[in-house]
């Protein structure tokens, strides 16, 4: 399987799950979500979800598409909010107008908020898993995207604006801001595939999978 094959799988199988969930949403809001999801992107996180499951021989696990869509929604929402005037104030994302420029700030905030919530709705409805496993997946994504992870890293980034960071501080920031979701992608793929969890840490199958921590990937992005 190539990266292109996994990327095509996401577009044909995981992304439609999001579109189905939005079928009753106001057309203009649905259009803004579609715009945000269509602006380029390598789909690295959903690809890692697929690759983790494939390493376990469970590339066909029914929950994989929900996990892949969920983590890409969280990643996309983070970019939308990161681009806002209160954060990085970016006009372009991957060569295209950022969402708040293509639409407006209020729409961008609402789309980001909605994407974050929909990610957890997808995990709560992931097929082929028992309730404990779904809760473990929700726990993984919540920790990776919240204060102990991505949000905490973004705060360190914003707080350092105009100042100088030591190499250790820079590593810590990227370990949270980017590395946390990389680790979560691998863990979600493991959960979707039924990987055994570490004793005492039911939300974390990574040790059983011998997965890398993701911090260096976060620093090298």
Regions found by a protein language model. Name each.
Residues 1-21:
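N-terminal amphipathic/basic leader segments beginning at the initiator methionine
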Residues 19, 23-221:
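Mg2+-dependent prenyl diphosphate-binding active-site environment of isoprenoid biosynthetic enzymes
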